[in-house]
Regions:
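Arg/Lys-rich, positively charged N-terminal/basic patches that mediate binding to nucleic acids
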Residues: 1-32
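Short alpha-helical segments used as structural interaction elements across diverse proteins
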Residues: 2, 26, 31, 59-60, ...
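Short proline/glycine- and basic residue-enriched helix-capping loop/turn segments at helix->loop/beta transitions
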Residues: 43-46
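Basic/aromatic recognition patch in beta-strand/loop cores that engages polyanionic ligands
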Residues: 49-78
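Enriched for short, Lys/Arg-rich terminal
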Residues: 70, 74-97
């Protein structure tokens, strides 16, 4: 079984999304969102090639679309390192950088 780790930026992304969900939809939906993301991270850790190449953002990076979010990560010998989590609405702005 692979393992996943989050960078500080990815951890901050997840916290921001959780807090938005908490304030907008309540604790139950926010917690369900967080658990769903954790399951996705575990899936990626076990199957690092599930995502597709994201070399256009960073050499060696991979991306995986999950629900309305894009998870960027790097393959590691023992799993994956989640580098950022971005809502799909933010993707056009990210491409402009």
């Amino acid at each position: 079984m692979g393992r996943y780790r989050l960078t500080k930026d990815a951890d901050a992304d997840l916290l921001t999304m959780f807090l938005y969900g908490f304030e907008t939809f309540g604790v139950a939906r926010a917690d369900a969102f967080r658990m769903d993301m954790v399951r996705c991270f575990e899936l990626l850790a076990d199957n690092p090639r599930l995502g597709r190449s994201a070399d256009e953002f960073a050499p060696g990076a991979r991306r995986h679309e999950h629900a309305r979010h894009v998870i960027f990560y790097d393959e590691q010998p023992d799993g994956v390192l989640i580098t950022s989590i971005i809502h799909e609405r933010s993707m056009p702005r990210l491409r402009e950088r």
